[in-house]
Amino acid sequence: MRKQLSVGITFGLIFLSIAVTAVVTVLAMQHKTNDVLGDLPEKMARYEMLDEVDSIISEHYYGSNDQKVLRHAVANGYVCGLNDGFSRLLTSEEYAQYLAVNRGQMQGVGLSYHKTDSGSLKVDTVSGGSPAAKAGIKKGDEIVAVDAIVLDLSNCDEIAQKLENPSVLSVSLTFRHKGQETTVDLEKGYEAASVSSESYQNIGYIRISEFYDSTASQVQETVDLFLASGVRALILDVRDNASTNIENAISTLDVFVPLNQEAPAATLLNKAGETVTAFSTSAGEVNLPMAVLVSKGTQSAGELFACDLRDFGKAQLVGQKTAGNALVGQSFRLSDGDSLLLSVGVMMPYKSDSFNQAGLLPDVEAELNEKTEKITKDSQFLAAASLFTE
């Protein structure tokens, strides 16, 4: 037979529960209040100068101002004060472009250039796979007219904006190559090529400039072709690769290394040192001698890729000490539609200690004697190739 509590005891327990809850709530609120009050002087000092500047501008500034622009500038200045290369504030349009570029989706025609003394545009680089490349424009060519308007010193800067303006979807270019002028119509937008390759004395060379969504599949296709041709070694070039896309870097790494068994292939740690994400590799691998070319400009996902290849025992590093940037970024959407990019953690490689600020020391140090597009004149490439010819 179940015993029932009396009404008095029941109400007493209810009141006791309410009292305990109230005490706990008060203590929690007091703790939170103490934290807030403790931060109050710092917060007041933080905004005191801004309030003072705002007051002076409101009273004395002769011109007009756009409050939204001012708010964005203030927030952007705050972020810039972090002195962090990744962290920044982007408008909604800038953020959309940032995402597209990270995926390898470019908006322009694939040219970089500089203005000549006559007002024409001298082509410095042509992106592989771009509309300009497909139209036959080469490095060193001159753009002499845009949309049938001949370029000169008086109009060059204004007319050239048509090449950069994302709202202009197509453009007609007249370019001069070895004295001959050609006019082409170009549609803007293309998927950037991040992988190029060639052979040297039965050694396969693969240049990886970025880690885009399509990079891993491009690398896999290139490796398959090299394996079918019977190359005896591979040289992977990630010099100046400063990509921040870790997931794509691990997907590309997966082409070369086996299943990670001792630890995650890469681990992302937050501010508290807690694991946020752990990346793995699959069972496939390449069983050839390999070297990785690195430089002072190799950083972030480029460094992780190189470090992991060495940690897996698959490759030696050749070149210069790398940049030492292992910070991980995250985007935060703000209430006005802007986005905040912020460094929120650090990436850890397969076995090595963190390379953040320390960089990666190459197994074989080699300086680049000159900037060249020919690997046969590339001193760092030749230093790597010598590992497989001795």
Q: Where in the sequence are the language-model features?
A:
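Terminal targeting/pro-maturation regions of precursor/exported proteins
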Residues: 2-88, 116-119
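Conserved PDZ fold ligand-binding element
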Residues: 54, 132-156, 234-237, 317
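Extended, small/polar residue-biased N-terminal targeting/export presequences
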Residues: 58-121, 170-172, 176-185
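Gly/Ser/Thr-rich loop/hinge elements
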Residues: 192-195, 242-300, 326-333, 345-348, ...
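PDZ domains, with a preference for the canonical peptide-binding region formed by the helix
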Residues: 142-174, 248, 325-326, 331
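STAS-typified acidic loop motif
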Residues: 199-215
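A short, well-ordered alpha-helical element
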Residues: 212-232
